[in-house]
């Protein structure tokens, strides 16, 4: 899980979702998991 100020999809399978007012990226590749912090 990477915590960064701006989250962007890295590959075509990355999906941007909102959980508990947090913007997150979920993907099949675990390296692409991101969260806005």
Swiss-Prot record:
State the superkingdom.
Bacteria
Q: Which GO terms describe its molecular function?
A: structural constituent of ribosome
| Pfam family name, one | Ribosomal_L36
Looking up InterPro entries in the UniProt record yields: Ribosomal_bL36 (IPR000473), Ribosomal_bL36_sp (IPR035977)
A GO CC term assigned to this protein in UniProt: cytoplasm
**Which NCBIfam families does the protein's record reference?**
rpmJ_bact
Name the family the entry cites. Belongs to the bacterial ribosomal protein bL36 family.
Could you identify this protein by its name? Large ribosomal subunit protein bL36
Gene, per the UniProt record: rpmJ
